[in-house]
Amino acid sequence: MTQQEYRSPSQRLSKGRSMSLPKIFARNLRSLQNNAPPGKNINVNCLNVNSCSLSASPSSQINMACNGNKQDLPIPFPLHVECNDSWSSSKLNKFKSMFNHNRSKSSGTTDASTSEKGTHKREPRSTIHTELLQSSIIGEPNVHSTTSSTLIPNEAICSTPNEISGSSSPDAELFTFDMPTDPSSFHTPSSPSYIAKDSRNLSNGSLNDINENEELQNFHRKISENGSASPLANLSLSNSPIDSPRKNSETRKDQIPMNITPRLRRAASEPFNTAKDGLMREDYIALKQPPSLGDIVEPRRSRRLRTKSFGNKFQDITVEPQSFEKIRLLGQGDVGKVYLVRERDTNQIFALKVLNKHEMIKRKKIKRVLTEQEILATSDHPFIVTLYHSFQTKDYLYLCMEYCMGGEFFRALQTRKSKCIAEEDAKFYASEVVAALEYLHLLGFIYRDLKPENILLHQSGHVMLSDFDLSIQATGSKKPTMKDSTYLDTKICSDGFRTNSFVGTEEYLAPEVIRGNGHTAAVDWWTLGILIYEMLFGCTPFKGDNSNETFSNILTKDVKFPHDKEVSKNCKDLIKKLLNKNEAKRLGSKSGAADIKRHPFFKKVQWSFLRNQDPPLIPALNDNGCELPFILSCNKHPKRNSVSEQETKMFCEKVANDDEIDEADPFHDFNSMSLTKKDHNILTYSENYTYGKILYKATCTRPRHNSSHRSFFKDIIPEL
C-alpha cells in the first residue's frame, strides 16, 4: 500500500491478519464509487437482520453513521449491486473480479497488501438515516442448496428491489454470490455468516484481535458435542421487503427514518437460539431443584416419637396441665380420675384422664397404660375415641381424649325402667360394636373388656369404645386375607396368639379365661354375645349370687331366654353361637368379624353406612342439671382438704420432655405428644349450656315392629 493511500486505524491494526467481510465490502464500495460515472448517484441498500442504507455520492464520499464506531458495519448479505446509468461491461467485470479476489483472500490466515486505485480523502462524517428491515425467512433453495443473497442499489429504502430509478442499461450486469445453507458447509472460514461480530461485546480495537478460525473451530466443536445442527440449516434468507413477515409494521409503513447503530452479529459463535436454549436450561434446572425448607412447615417431633408407628400423626406436645380448666369429675378408678376440662386457648372441652404414677407402679399397671396409649394413638375409627394430647409430669400421666356427651352406655340403659331396649335398637348398637372390634383385630389388638360401662355415647348418638387398659397386642400377627370376595378374614391377624391373663368383668368372662387355658381374639365375640343379651333383657345370662356361682354358671350352664320378651329366632341363634363354650366352634373364631356379618340377624344392616344412620338415642343436656358457671365458681374457691390439694397439683405440674426422661424410668415409653391434624368438630364451651345430667331423646323414625314395649321412650327417667 503506497504512502499516499489513506489507511484507517483499524486497517493498521489488522495488518498481517485476515480482513473481515465488512471491511472488504466497505473497500469495494469505495472502489465502486471511484469508478462511478460523473454526475450519477449510486444507492446501496443492505437488507439483513441489522440493515442500513449507504449513499455513494459522485465525489467518492461514503457517509456512514456508526455512533462513534467506524468498524460497526452491516453484514453484507443479502447483496445485490446495480447501476442507475449505463456502465461498460468491462468496469463491472473488473469490479466483480476484484470483489471475488478479495473475498477469496479473506479466508487465509494472512492478508497480502493490495493497492486500491484512486486517492481516498477523509471527509467529515454525516449522519446516515438507516432503517431496520426484517429479512424474510421465505425462500426456496435451489438445486445447489444455496440461497441467493443480493445487495440492491435503490433511491429509496422501501422501494421494490426490481425497480431502478432512472433508466437502466440493457447491458447492466447483475452481481450475485451464493451463501450455503447446508449445515455441513458451515465450517468454511470464508462463509460470511461466520464473520459477523456482536458490537456489544467488541470495541474498535478488539474487533481485529479475535482469531476468526479459532472461534469457528470452537463453535463447531460445541455443536458436535451437543449434537445440534446449525440454526441456519433450514432457513432461506431473502432481502425482499415484500416477503417480510413484518412488512405491515408502523416503521415500514410510515417510512420514518431512524438513527440506529448497525449491529454485527457473529452467527457462528452466538447462534440465534442461544438465548432461548439458555432460558429453557434455567427453567429445567429450576424444576429439578427441591423445594426450600422454608416452604414446608414440618412439625417438631422428639427422637422417640419419630420411632413410633403413629409418629406421623402427632407432634411434640403443645399443651400443659395449666392449659386446661377443670369443670367437673366424670369418673374415677383405682389409679386415676377422668375430668371434664376446658382448654383455655381454644375454648374446647375434652375428657382428661389423669393417672397417678405411684399407684400404677404399686399395682403393676405400667404396661396397661402404655398399651392404652398405643391403641388410642394408632386408631383412627369413628367408633373409637380420639386421642388429642398425651403427656406426663413428675407424678402424673395425662390422656386428653374426645368428650362423649352421652356418657356411658350403661347409664343410658339405666334410664329405662326395664333396663333394656328393643331388638332393632340392639341390632344398631351391636353393628357398630362389631365394626369397632373388627378394626381393632385388624390392627392386631384384642379388646378383652367389652361391657356397657366401656361404651360411650357420642353427641351424635353413635357408640365409641374406650378404656383399653385391659387390651393386649397379639404378637406374630399375620396379614389379613380375603375370603368369599367381599368378606375379610380378620381372625387371621391374631391367629395362634393366646394369653393366660385373668382380666375382664366377671359376668363377661369367657370360659377359656376362667379355666386359665389361654385365650385368643374369640373372647371378644363371647363378650359381644353377653352385651346383646343384656341390651335385650336387661341382665347378663350367667349372673350368680357371688363370683364363684357366676363362674360355675359360665362353665356349666347353657344360655336361656326369658319368656316375657319376644325376640326373633335369628337373634336367639346369634346369641347361642356367640356364647358357645367351645372356643373352636364359636362364631367368629374362624374368620373373625366376617362370620358375624354373614349371620341372618345382620342381613339388612348396611355396614358401609352405619355412620349415616339415625341412632336410637340422642343425648341432650338436661336443664335440671348443675349450671356450669356455678361449677367454675366453686372450682375457683375449692375446699382446703387433701383431695382438692391433690387435684390442684394435677393441673400445676410441668410437662417432662421425651428426650429428657431417663431410660431407666418405667414410663420412658410414654410419649408426650399432640395430634397434628386439627379437629373442628370438637365441642366448645358455652355459658348457655349446662354440663350436668343428661337426657336421652328418642329417634321416633326408627322401626320397632318386634318390640313388645310400645311405650319404649316414654318411661325415660329424667335424671341419671
Swiss-Prot record:
EC assignment: 2.7.11.1
One Gene Ontology term of the molecular function aspect: protein serine/threonine kinase activity
One Gene Ontology CC term in the entry: nucleus
Record field: compositional bias (Polar residues): 1-13, 99-116
Modified residues (Phosphoserine): 203
Pfam name, any one: Pkinase
Positions annotated as active site in the UniProt record: 449
Residues covered by region (Disordered): 1-20, 99-128, 230-257
Compositional bias segments (type: Low complexity): 230-241
Domain Protein kinase: from-to ranges: 324-602
Catalytic activity: L-seryl-[protein] + ATP = O-phospho-L-seryl-[protein] + ADP + H(+); L-threonyl-[protein] + ATP = O-phospho-L-threonyl-[protein] + ADP + H(+)
InterPro entries associated with the record: Kinase-like_dom_sf (IPR011009), Prot_kinase_dom (IPR000719), Ser/Thr_kinase_AS (IPR008271)
SMART domains: S_TKc
Compositionally biased intervals (Basic and acidic residues): 244-255
GO aspect biological process, one term: phospholipid translocation
Reported phenotype of the disruption mutant: Simultaneous knockout of FPK1 leads to decreased phosphatidylcholine and glucosylceramide transport into the cell.
Keywords: ATP-binding, Kinase, Lipid transport, Nucleotide-binding, Phosphoprotein, Serine/threonine-protein kinase, Transferase, Transport
Binding site for ATP: 330-338, 353
Record PANTHER family: FLIPPASE KINASE 1-RELATED (PTHR45637)
Family: Belongs to the protein kinase superfamily. Ser/Thr protein kinase family. KIN82 subfamily.
Record function comment: Flippase activator that phosphorylates DFN1 and DFN2 and which is involved in the generation of phospholipid asymmetry in membranes by the inward translocation of phospholipids.
Name of this protein: Serine/threonine-protein kinase KIN82
Species for this entry: Saccharomyces cerevisiae (strain ATCC 204508 / S288c)
Gene: KIN82
